[in-house]
Swiss-Prot record:
Pathway as given in its UniProt record: Amine and polyamine biosynthesis; spermidine biosynthesis; spermidine from putrescine: step 1/1
Enzyme class of the recorded protein, top EC level: transferase
Entry-linked HAMAP family: Spermidine_synth
The reaction(s) this protein catalyses: S-adenosyl 3-(methylsulfanyl)propylamine + putrescine = S-methyl-5'-thioadenosine + spermidine + H(+)
GO molecular function ontology, one term from the record: spermidine synthase activity
Entry GO terms, CC: cytosol
The protein, known as: Spermidine synthase
Binding site for S-adenosyl 3-(methylsulfanyl)propylamine: Q56, Q87, D111, E131, D162, G163, D181
Length: 316
C-alpha cells in the first residue's frame, strides 16, 4: 500500500497512478474526453490497490470524504458514501415495476452492488451475472465487502466473460429482467451501448420483460442519450422511458437510466406495482435501503425541459 503522493518533485509526479493529479499533489482528478473542460477531484488519503487487468487499469484509494473509491481507467465507479444511490436505483426501478420477477440477469456489475439490491426481492429465484473482468470482482470482494456481499447470495451464478457473447447464447425469453451496469461507452463497455446489443437483450427477455441500463448524464451526454432512446424505441415495443438520479461523485453529479419493456403485459415504469419497503426486515443480514423509495422512483422520470424535449422528440 502506498500513501497518496504529496510531493512536487518531477520524479514522484511521473510515478503517479492514473487520475492522481500532479497539479494538486495528493488529489485524484477525474479527467476524460467524455466530459471535456471539467474535472471532479477527491482528496486521496492512501492508495490501497493498483493493478492492470486484461481490460483496464484498476485502482482503489481511501478518500478523505467519500470513504474507499473504486476507479477503472481513471473513472470513478463507486464510492462507499454514495454508491447506494446508483445501485439501488438501477436495480429497483425495473424490479419494482413488474410483478414477482423470478429470473434476473446482470451484465457488468462486478462490484456486486446490483446483486445486493436484486437479492432484496424474495420472488427472485435465479440471478445470473456476467462480468468481463475478474479483477474487478476480486478487488471489490477485498476492499468493498458491504457492496460485494451480493456475491454471497445462493441464487447468484457468476459468469466471467463477455456480456455481448453471453446474451447471444441465452435462449429466447429467458429473463424477467436484465440490468446492464456498464461503465462509459469507451473501452470494454462500448458494445453495451450499440443497437445489436439491445436487440440481444430484447430477445432474451420474456414478453413484458424489462431492461434497465446505465444511460449517462443529461448535462454531458444528450447526444449519446438521443441515440440510445432512438435505438430502444425501434427495438422495444412496450414501454420506453428515461429516468435519472443524483450521484455526487459521478460527472455532473447525476446519472441516467434507460428503462424498456418488450411487447406483452404492459409496464408502467413511473408507478411501481411491486414496492419494496425500506424497513421490511426481509433479511437479518441485509441493511435497510439508504436511497430508494416509491416516491423517488416516480420522481426519477420527471425530466428538465431541455432533456424532455430531446427525448420526447424520439417518440414514435
Amino acid at each position: 500500500m502506498a500513501d497518496a503522493v504529496n510531493s512536487n518533485s518531477k520524479e514522484e509526479a511521473a510515478q503517479l497512478p492514473d487520475g492522481v493529479s500532479s497539479v494538486i499533489p495528493g488529489w485524484f482528478s477525474e479527467i476524460s474526453p467524455m466530459w471535456p473542460g471539467e474535472a471532479h477531484s477527491l482528496k486521496v488519503e492512501k492508495i490501497l490497490f493498483q493493478g492492470k487487468s486484461d481490460y483496464q487499469n484498476v485502482m482503489v484509494f481511501q478518500s478523505s470524504t467519500y470513504g474507499k473509491v473504486l476507479v477503472l481507467d481513471g473513472v470513478i465507479q463507486l464510492t462507499e458514501r454514495d454508491e447506494c444511490a446508483y445501485q439501488e436505483m438501477i436495480a429497483h426501478l425495473p424490479l419494482c415495476s413488474i410483478p414477482s420477477p423470478k429470473k434476473v440477469l446482470v451484465i457488468g456489475g462486478g462490484d456486486g452492488g446490483v446483486l445486493r439490491e436484486v437479492a432484496r426481492h424474495l420472488s427472485v429465484e435465479q440471478i445470473d451475472i456476467c462480468e468481463i473482468d475478474k479483477m474487478v470482482v476480486d478487488v471489490s470482494k477485498q476492499f468493498f465487502p458491504d457492496v460485494a456481499v451480493g456475491f454471497e447470495d445462493p441464487r447468484v451464478v457468476l459468469h466471467i466473460g463477455d456480456g455481448v457473447a453471453f446474451l447471444k447464447a441465452v435462449p429466447e425469453g429467458t429473463y424477467d429482467a436484465i440490468i446492464v451496469d456498464s461503465s462509459d461507452p469507451i473501452g470494454p463497455a462500448q458494445e453495451l451501448f450499440e443497437k445489436p446489443f439491445f436487440e440481444s437483450v430484447a430477445k432474451a427477455l420474456r414478453p413484458g420483460g424489462v431492461v434497465c441500463t446505465q444511460a449517462e448524464s443529461i448535462w454531458l451526454h444528450m447526444h449519446i442519450i438521443e441515440d440510445i432512446v432512438a435505438n430502444c424505441r425501434q427495438i422495444f415495443k412496450g414501454s420506453v422511458n428515461y429516468a435519472w438520479t443524483t450521484v455526487p461523485t459521478y460527472p455532473s453529479g447525476v446519472i441516467g437510466f434507460m428503462l424498456c419493456s418488450t411487447e406483452g403485459p404492459p409496464v408502467d415504469f413511473k408507478h411501481p406495482i411491486n414496492p419494496i419497503d425500506a424497513n421490511d426486515g426481509r433479511s437479518k443480514t441485509m441493511k435497510p435501503l439508504k436511497f430508494y423509495n416509491s416516491e423517488i422512483h416516480s420522481a426519477a422520470f420527471c425530466l428538465p425541459s431541455f432533456a424532455k424535449k430531446v427525448i420526447d422528440s424520439k417518440a414514435n
